[in-house]
């Protein structure tokens, strides 16, 4: 039996995920720049939606890259 993953944001009592907190957002992005799914990270549906929105805003404002590198 595997241990059930716990939502880090619920434990910390976070009200909203801030798009300016780039260091926290980087933990939920793969090396290729994709958003890690909640079944892997264990985040609840509420915070996964906020996380996706925050990552997309940070990408739009060039705080985070859309992808890791470009191939020719």
Curated annotation (Swiss-Prot):
Keywords recorded for this protein, A-Z: Ribonucleoprotein, Ribosomal protein, RNA-binding, rRNA-binding
GO biological process, one term: translation
CC annotations in GO: cytosolic small ribosomal subunit
Coiled-coil region: none
Gene3D superfamilies: Ribosomal protein S18
InterPro entries: Ribosomal_bS18, Ribosomal_bS18_CS, Ribosomal_bS18_sf
Family: Belongs to the bacterial ribosomal protein bS18 family.
Subunit organization: Part of the 30S ribosomal subunit. Forms a tight heterodimer with protein bS6.
NCBIfam families registered for this protein in UniProt: S18
Descriptive protein name: Small ribosomal subunit protein bS18
């Amino acid at each position: 039996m595997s241990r059930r993953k716990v939502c880090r944001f619920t434990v910390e009592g976070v009200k909203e995920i801030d798009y300016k907190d780039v260091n926290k957002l980087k933990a939920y992005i793969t090396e290729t720049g994709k958003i890690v799914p909640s079944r892997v990270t264990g985040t609840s549906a509420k915070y996964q939606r906020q996380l996706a929105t925050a990552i997309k805003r940070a990408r739009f404002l060039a705080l985070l890259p859309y992808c890791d590198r470009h191939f020719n």
